[in-house]
Amino acid sequence: MDAMASPGKDNYRMKSYKNKALNPQEMRRRREEEGIQLRKQKREEQLFKRRNVSLPPGDESMLECPIQDPDVSSTVPVSGEGVITQDVIQMIFSEDPDQQLIATQKFRKLLSKEPNPPIDEVIGTPGVVNRFVEFLRRSDNCTLQFEAAWALTNIASGTFQHTKVVIETGAVPIFIELLNSEYEDVQEQAVWALGNIAGDNAECRDYVLNCGILPSLQQLLAKSNRLTTTRNAVWALSNLCRGKNPPPDFAKVSPCLSVLSRLLFSSDPDVLADACWALSYLSDGPNDKIQTVIDSGVCRRLVELLMHSDYKVVSPALRAVGNIVTGDDIQTQVILNCSALPCLLHLLSSPKESIKKEACWTVSNITAGNRAQIQAVIDSNVFPVLIEILQKAEFRTRKEAAWAITNATSGGTPEQIRYLVSLNTIKPMCDLLTVMDSKIVQVALNGLENILRLGEQESKQNGTGINPYCALIEEAYGLDKIEFLQSHENQEIYQKAFDLIEHYFGVEEEDASIVPQVDQNQGQYIFQQSEGPMEGFQL
């Protein structure tokens, strides 16, 4: 996900660039919503394994209920294209339990075909999906329950229309009942189906929540001793917590925080990863939600998991920690008190670019805090690494590092800003002035303005009248770049560029081709568009 702020927040922040310090609440950047999407890759990886693997050796029996797997290939005729035959349809509607089982297994195997299971063909066969749902109620025949649940799971792994068919047949309340089945295979298949359904979109997620899944799901997670069941259950739980347009009813999902806090101590990376994903979703919101997550006691363990050896755990743990520090200063301090900064320093050197970017984003929200928090970042030796990232990393990561540095110049003390200058931060900030991303040009201009403002104060205090940072910016070719920005298509950028030159880089003889005219009617500057560098900007 992109970690940039919402347009509203950014616009407000940029409009107040002449203030001595940016509002810390505005400097904090929540995650921009990209729409509710399934973790499709995760879900498809699981289903890929299920569709391609028959019942594993040694797993062909359930507690007091042996799985029956007749040789359906010799019993049921199928055409070369796998078309459903009348014989199979007759068998599934038979009153003979053996015939029902053979036919259901046949459908399940069809639905387990890769890469394109014939889901449309199955749901287009009148009465078949309803028949599967009927079989879910057959508590006297757990094998039939299991096979029907498996078939419905694979139907629900398809498109929204496929999932909708399963919902409309009334399967969800029955699946929730089956979470309390005495047979673990049935429990596991039921929770897998519910995870597929809840993961489709917000409408499906909320329907499953409104059917009352959470108590049974929490109970399953509390008592299950089977790792695969726990994995599927926590994955389903993460799908129930997922989404922002709209988010799930927090009152319905927040009770799962207690079980999630326990799952964070699992030794299984898959369980840890999905528990962290769930917490990242729950913490992605306003401060009251963040506080509820903090109050559940998960922060210290989340910070510990930043050092996990498996990236699939580190990534969601970092996402959750990053979301928590978008809160207020007190909430941010909870994370800092868990010794997060040494962990973040480690992640800033990660070979995985997405981890590095998220770590920069997290630090940027810490440097949007108070001066003591900025000092904590300084004391952890994070800034030298950020400045190196600003020079060498991929652009999306450089953007986050720029936010971190500009936020520190906005809220920092004079001594803290001088420290940043001593690390040679001016040159890489000047280099950002020619990028195509207008928002980052504004961020860089803000950071440089904060440094220049300090220099002006120093020049008045020491009586020299010379701003020491003007020369550093000129040496970094920053003045040339700021002059070019006077022809930028973005009004806020060209006004800021003009203001900086006028205020800090006044020249004896003004060049009429550079100084903008003023449109008296519109109350804004007018610039010659042709003066912009042809390759530097979109004009």
Swiss-Prot record:
One of its GO terms (molecular function) is nuclear localization sequence binding. GO terms for biological process: animal organ development; NLS-bearing protein import into nucleus. SUPFAM superfamilies: ARM repeat (SSF48371). ARM repeats lie at residues 117-157, 160-199, 202-242, 245-284, 287-326, 329-368, 371-410, 414-453. Residues 1-60 form the IBB domain. It holds the Pfam family Arm. Keywords: Cytoplasm, Protein transport, Repeat, Transport. Its main location: cytoplasm. This is Importin subunit alpha-6.
